[in-house]
């Protein structure tokens, strides 16, 4: 695996602490950006979904480098993702939990207290270069104390968006858009 600086959709390096929308690499019917949502019996929006609407940017995500405050974000190195935390959640940090109802490992935020009765995995996320198109990437989750790594894909459970899940095929190919240059909607000049 090559090691490269992670670039946004405008070919600018991604920096820790900056806010970015995670959007599909291919625009159109595949949907829009990622956001938090309530799923199943949850009273708090702690599940990460990809919005169905291709003109919806979702919620910006902030990347940090564990143990380092600055520097460039490089492919294949651990990153932590944070999204604006709802009051009801214990943490804004991305995590992986198993939803027993759909029998899938899903991306969410927070820890055990945010996903009662569900298995929560500890591990790290990395950003890896995707095969297509230019400046596109995939997110990967590696379990702690294991050599097991899985791509982050999508699963549609008819919950107002597609859940981000662990998969070994069909990764969600994404681009990062600097949130400071976009307000979260696409407009036409008409």
UniProtKB/Swiss-Prot annotation:
Protein name: Subtilisin inhibitor CLSI-II
Function field: Inhibits subtilisin-type microbial serine proteases incuding proteinase K, subtilisin BPN', subtilisin Carlsberg and subtilisin E in a non-stoichiometric manner. Weakly inhibits A.oryzae protease and some metalloproteases including pronase E. Does not inhibit trypsin, chymotrypsin, S.griseus alkaline protease or A.lyticus lysyl endopeptidase. CLSI-II has a wider inhibitory specificity than CLSI-III.
SUPFAM superfamilies: STI-like
GO molecular function ontology, one term from the record: serine-type endopeptidase inhibitor activity
Cellular component terms per the entry's GO annotation: extracellular region
InterPro entries in the cross-refs: Kunitz_inhibitor_STI-like_sf (IPR011065), Prot_inh_Kunz-lg (IPR002160)
Disulphide bridges: 44-88, 142-149
Pfam families per UniProt: Kunitz_legume
Keyword tags: Disulfide bond, Protease inhibitor, Secreted, Serine protease inhibitor
UniProt subunit comment: Forms active dimers on storage in aqueous solution, possibly through formation of an intermolecular disulfide bond.
Record site feature (Reactive bond), residues: 68-69
PTM notes: The N-terminal Asn is removed in about 50% of both the CLSI-II and CLSI-III chains.
Originating organism: Canavalia lineata (Beach bean)
